[in-house]
């Protein structure tokens, strides 16, 4: 079935063997907990990623750039060039540091113009001092939100507790309430379910037409029962499937969705249709 649906992954990153040593110390313990320490140590090649997509029945991924404290594990330029080279397989999500002010603002604009970027990826835990992050309603984000609304691209934010040894309080979903009220034209997704505050994230997505819940880094087998029911009923139009590849594999996350027993239409929305609409991939 997954091959027919043609899944779209809302959050994945390619960290090549040449860049795998750049992961900061605060991340390695979570790679061990997920049982993928060696995967991250070795990195992945583009060919490996494409093969794994094919084997899992994943048609396309939102290929996210990832930069942490200046270390470009996958730069906007790298992600953008891959998206241009393989437009049927990748759409690009750029990333910027909102602390960089107008430099970040213009970088978003560049990525849209040069690479047809479809989303901005933000990780609030990264924009602080390592103990306190910057919640999504911090006004330093607002020029970026305005630019994304103007350019008609989405914003996907890491919401919930962090896996890395970095601050989590800034990931409370309620901070998105103010953002959604201020920018009703902006398409917003809270990534990683927002756990352990997933009930709040689910309610925000139900409340606001422009807010969605994204599932990356959370294996479907372990999704809370309330979220499984949400995907099958009252929230089925507001959920985006993702992996946070290579943290979770494409095949595992597709297969485990298959095992949830969702209605076919709900499953199709989760794996593909909602992402097509949210990221405007058919435009």
Where are these regions (language model features)?
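Short aromatic-enriched loop/helix-cap "lid" or pocket-rim segments at secondary-structure transitions
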Residues: 18-24, 75-76, 105-106, 132-134, ...
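Amphipathic, non-transmembrane alpha-helical secondary structure
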Residues: 46-54, 73-80, 84, 102-113, ...
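Mid-to-C-terminal alpha-helical segments outside catalytic/metal-binding sites
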Residues: 2-60, 110, 233-240, 248-283
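Active-site gating/metal-coordination segments in enzymes
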Residues: 59-60, 69-157, 161-163, 167-170, ...
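Active-site-adjacent C-terminal substructures of enzyme catalytic domains
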Residues: 187, 194-252, 260-265
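Active-site acidic short loop of glycosyltransferases
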Residues: 58, 88, 150, 185, ...
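Hydrophobic faces of well-ordered beta-strands that scaffold small-molecule active sites
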Residues: 8-12, 61-63, 91-94, 120-122, ...
């Amino acid at each position: 079935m997954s091959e027919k649906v043609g899944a779209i992954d809302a959050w994945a990153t390619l960290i090549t063997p040449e860049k795998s040593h750049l992961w900061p110390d605060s991340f390695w313990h979570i790679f061990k907990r997920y049982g993928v320490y060696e995967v991250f140590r070795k990195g992945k090649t583009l060919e490996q990623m494409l093969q794994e997509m094919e084997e899992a029945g994943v048609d396309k991924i939102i290929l996210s750039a990832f930069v942490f404290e200046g270390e470009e594990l996958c730069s906007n330029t790298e992600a953008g060039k891959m998206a241009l080279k393989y437009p049927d397989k990748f759409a690009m999500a750029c990333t910027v540091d909102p602390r960089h002010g107008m430099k970040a603002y213009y970088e978003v604009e560049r990525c849209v113009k040069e690479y047809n970027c479809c989303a901005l990826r933000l990780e609030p835990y990264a924009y602080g001092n390592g103990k306190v992050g910057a919640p999504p309603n911090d006004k330093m984000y607002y020029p970026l939100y305005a630019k994304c609304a103007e350019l008609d691209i989405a914003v996907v934010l890491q919401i919930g507790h962090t896996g890395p040894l970095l601050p989590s309080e800034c990931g409370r979903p309620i901070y998105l309430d103010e953002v959604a009220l201020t920018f009703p034209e902006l398409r917003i997704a809270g990534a990683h379910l927002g756990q352990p505050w997933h009930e709040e994230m689910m309610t925000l997505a139900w409340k606001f037409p422009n807010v969605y819940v994204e599932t990356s880094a959370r294996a479907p087998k372990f999704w809370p029962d309330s979220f499984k029911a949400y995907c099958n009923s009252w929230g089925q139009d507001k959920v985006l499937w993702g992996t946070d590849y290579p943290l979770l594999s494409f095949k595992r996350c597709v297969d485990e969705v298959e095992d949830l027993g969702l209605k076919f239409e709900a499953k199709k929305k989760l794996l593909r249709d909602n992402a097509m609409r949210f990221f405007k991939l058919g435009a």
